A protein has these predicted regions:
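Acyl-donor (CoA/ACP) binding surface of acyl/acetyltransferases
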Residues: 2-23, 63, 68-149
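Short loop/turn motifs at secondary-structure junctions and domain boundaries
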Residues: 54-60
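A short, well-structured alpha-helix characteristic of acyl/acetyltransferase catalytic modules
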Residues: 1-50
Length: 149
């Protein structure tokens, strides 16, 4: 009998595109996901399309989709990119609940942080999280973020 070995998932991030809007709306409207997110629920496709259109060409933010083995599974990005002061705000939200806890967020975050510190030449990345969002806090500590306040 052949034994099948588990291989690690291939994780990548890519720029958020118009085609990703329905998935983002689905993920955010899922009660398992939106407890720690700051959105007016239910999120609507039309409102999200307007958000997307209003952000085209902006250089002060970078919105991306996380893919694991080619399947979209969450969003990640940088907000308030301030090149003058070399800083930005980081965010991440895993949408596919069945893929949580598999290390995808860690891998995607490392890719994004490499981009932020390498290509964008930033020297400070910060974030905000809810006090009760312990899984996210563990991820952020693992990535080297330091708790303030």
């Amino acid at each position: 009998m052949a034994r099948e070995e588990k291989r690690p998932m291939i994780v990548r991030i890519r720029k958020f595109e118009r085609k990703d809007i329905p998935k983002k709306v689905e993920w955010i409207n899922n009660p398992q996901n939106n407890k720690s997110l700051h959105y007016d629920i239910p999120l609507e496709v039309e409102k999200t399309q307007k958000w997307f259109d209003s952000n085209i060409g902006r250089t002060d933010r970078y919105d991306a989709v996380i893919e694991a083995d080619g399947v979209p599974c969450g969003t990640i990005g940088l907000l308030e990119i301030d090149k003058k002061n070399s800083k930005a705000e980081y965010y991440i939200a895993m949408g596919e609940t069945s893929l949580k806890g598999k290390g995808i967020s860690t891998q995607a975050s490392k890719i994004l942080l490499d981009y932020a510190f390498g290509e964008l030449k930033l020297n400070r990345i910060y974030l905000y999280t809810e006090t009760e969002n312990i899984p996210a806090q563990r991820l952020f500590e693992k990535l080297g973020f330091i708790k303030e306040g």
